[in-house]
């Protein structure tokens, strides 16, 4: 969210933007990486203690011998598309000209760019809510619920008419003020998918690595 807002405020009008406009953000990113390196370098992190093992015959099994782990890996790949797909393709569709080869709605690119921030704000809200209730319900119940909700929202986004509009907040990067614009309600449904995607990674990981025993470390590395 901060990246969308910061880059938008620095670049402003995309039509007149120059590479030099983004340089402050690059220096900020460099400073963050240097700070993180210094902290990690001077922090003594306790590594997991692993007992020395005698040389044994090669294990015939691995984490990939478990069916639910392999399904979890597949689910993570699909989840990745669910997480990054909506903000990317929503922007392309809303800003594409109506007479283009792949026609869109021809909306203002500056406003449409802020919808990515709205999507990730929904993800942030979902993470907070998921963190609060995660200890009270099982990962299976949570994943099942958000998956059904995501399917319903995606279907709504595909089927609802473009003429049905709803107001959605955005950011005027030039003046850093909140603005409201109208988007199809189906697009707003796609944005709400962020609420569902926010808790999927942790839930899928827990379900996929459950009961793996000594193969859990290797499974975690695979993820």
State each model region's role.
Residues 4-12, 128-135, 206:
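Small-residue-mediated transmembrane helix hinge/kink sites in multi-pass secondary transporters
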Residues 1, 198-216, 221:
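Intracellular juxtamembrane helix-capping segments at the cytosolic ends
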Residues 4-8, 63-121, 125:
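Extracytoplasmic gate region of multi-pass secondary transporters
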Residues 137-204:
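C-terminal transmembrane helical hairpin of 12-TM major facilitator-type secondary transporters
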Residues 47-72, 176-177:
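Juxtamembrane intracellular "pre-TM" segments in multi-pass secondary transporters
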Residues 40-52, 163:
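Helix-loop junctions on the cytosolic side of multi-pass membrane transporters
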Residues 21-22, 104-116, 182, 186, ...:
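Juxtamembrane helix-start elements in MFS-like secondary transporters
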Residues 1-45:
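Helix-loop-helix hairpin linking two adjacent transmembrane segments in secondary transporters
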């Amino acid at each position: 969210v901060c990246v969308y807002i910061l880059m938008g405020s620095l670049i402003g009008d995309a039509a007149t933007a120059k590479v030099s406009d983004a340089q402050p953000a690059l220096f900020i990113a460099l400073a963050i990486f240097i700070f993180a390196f210094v902290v990690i370098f001077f922090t003594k992190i306790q590594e997991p203690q692993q007992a020395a093992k005698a040389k044994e015959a090669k294990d015939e099994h691995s984490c990939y011998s478990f069916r639910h782990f392999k399904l979890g890996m597949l689910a993570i790949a699909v989840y990745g598309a669910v997480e990054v797909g909506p903000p990317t393709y929503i922007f392309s569709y809303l800003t594409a000209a109506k007479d283009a080869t792949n026609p869109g709605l021809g909306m203002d690119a500056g406003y449409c760019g802020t919808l990515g921030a709205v999507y990730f704000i929904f993800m942030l809200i979902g993470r907070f809510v998921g963190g609060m209730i995660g200890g009270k319900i099982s990962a299976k119940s949570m994943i099942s619920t958000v998956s059904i909700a995501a399917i319903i929202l995606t279907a709504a986004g595909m089927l609802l008419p473009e003429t049905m509009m709803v107001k959605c907040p955005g950011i005027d990067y030039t003046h850093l003020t909140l603005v409201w614009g109208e988007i199809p309600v189906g697009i707003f449904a796609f944005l709400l998918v962020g609420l569902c995607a926010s808790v999927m990674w942790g839930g899928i990981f827990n379900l996929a690595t459950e009961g793996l025993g000594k193969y859990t470390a290797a499974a975690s590395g695979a993820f």
